[in-house]
Amino acid sequence: MKTKNFFTVMAAAAALFLSAALPSAASDTKVGTDGAAFMKIPTGSPRAQAMGNNGVSLAEGGEAMGINPAGIASAQMREVSYANMSWFQEYSGQYLSYVHPIGQSVVGINLGYYGIDGFDVRDSEGKPQYGADVKVRNGYTSLAIAKGFFLEKLLIGVSAKQVLEDNYTTEYKNLVFDLGVILRIGRKLSLGWAGQNFSGKKHQVVKVNRLGGAYAFNPFMTLALEQKTYSDRKGRLGGGVEFSLPEEVLQVGRVSVRAGYSPADNLGKNLDDKSLGSLGLSDISGWSFGVGLYSAQALGYGMGFDYTLAPYGSLGKASQLALRFQF
């Protein structure tokens, strides 16, 4: 039936949806040729997302598992974190993680789930199929272990990850692996590298390589630079900055303001989202902004809140909110 055939086409479109939405250079002819494009999204780390998706040398605790597994080695306490991510065209996701120090090592487990609500399905003539129950489900779960060496100057982590991509007509399941390293030089400079999604079937899970560094000029300002290379896209250099008022200054907690940039195409102007217009971001793409609050004293536990907003021109905006608790 032509309707069923068109569902197949729509499923393929869903598989490429994120690749189209994620910024890409026009000259990159391989963009979208690898699956599980949702693995490019820094779900679970609004901090890294706010700094232009640059966090390979900075990520710590549960947020590190989706960026650089070595980062969980810095955890001194047990930590639970939850994040809610909103992407384009009703695409959204949730993230949950838990890290636990054991002796000289730290283990962590996380779960990420993504889906599309109200997916627009039409037949070959373009007529809406309101009764069609088309679901697009993406997700992953991983188990990580990391350890610090030389008084926490060198952090090494590895994780095994099961990735699911269900595009209605086709379902892919892949076991992949991540490896990461963070090297801290003195108190101000840190370097990081992470390779993600290795050993998956060819082209079914996009592979990611991150290489970057961060420099803390003082307790108030940190600058990060990072080169990200995907198996279906050329590498790009991005950067981000974080301004913080330490807890020692405010007495009640640390407040951070963040901004970052990664090169992106001109995605046009958004005429529908009034919030972007009021902020002067309706024709901005590539930039991201965020805030963070953290207190080591709240109710006797460590508590953190992070929020990020990333405009993408005519496509709309992405946002992410995360909470974490340390005990």
Predicted regions located by residue number:
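Cleavable N-terminal export/targeting peptides
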Residues: M1-F38
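Subset of outer-membrane beta-barrel
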Residues: S27-F327
